[in-house]
Amino acid sequence: GRKEDWNIVYGREGKREENHMKYMEQIGMRSKAASRSIGLLGQNRRNEALKQAAKELKKQAAFLLEENQKDIANAREKGMKESLIDRLMLTRERIAGIADGLLQIADLEDPIGIVTDMKVRPNGLRIGKKRVPLGVVGIIYESRPNVTADAFGLCLKSGNAVILRGGSDCIFSNKAIVSVLRKALNATQIEEDAVILIENTDRAVAQEIMRTNTYIDVLIPRGGAGLIQTVVKNSTVPVRSEEHTSELQ
């Protein structure tokens, strides 16, 4: 089966392609604007949106399955191994599991505002660490479409906007899931750009994400060693590697 090739190259003569730069700049601006309001939302609003997203995912299961079948058909046409196709595949049970995952995130303690390592100086000054939203989190990941909803849930819970770049193998599934998530945000009067999917599957765009340090505050690669090494090597955005994906606050 074909895995995403992370030996990313620029356009001719190694130059960054201007259209890719503009594409990412526009997305970055939208996400940064959304992050300002997301970071100010109270936990009840954030949890309400997560619960609405879970409800919408279950409600739109038929649509999600239909779009997922397009990815499955493309994968089989390319000769992908059945074991890898299974990672791509959505079923009603898996969609229910994804929705339940969002409900579990909603039930977690609010990470925003927690103060740790509080110390009192001799002069009485109290110094500690307070958890606050980062702003915009970028996540580059591979085939599993469940990551799309999980990443959205963890980022919204921690008051962050998220830019997602999934693997090209599951583009139809990811577009469908994100459209449902954005609908849920709209229904709860929250900025839809709290979650934006990079729909351009050109690998040079993935490279450009790693350069969008004006707008993306932290980049998280989730996938195989090749992906993680490429991001760590090429990114000018601060990187948190895969083992830290649950620590988004």
How would you describe each model-predicted region?
Residues 1, 11-14:
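Residue-identity detector for glycine
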Residues 20-126:
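N-terminal Rossmann-like NAD(P)+-binding subdomain of aldehyde/semialdehyde dehydrogenases
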Residues 27, 66, 168-170, 174-212, ...:
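Nucleotide-activated sugar donor-binding and catalytic core shared by glycosyltransferases
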Residues 87, 91, 104, 122-129, ...:
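A structured beta-alpha segment of the ubiquitous adenosine-cofactor-binding alpha/beta core
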Residues 136, 190, 197-246:
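Conserved NAD(P)+-binding/catalytic subdomain of aldehyde/semialdehyde dehydrogenases
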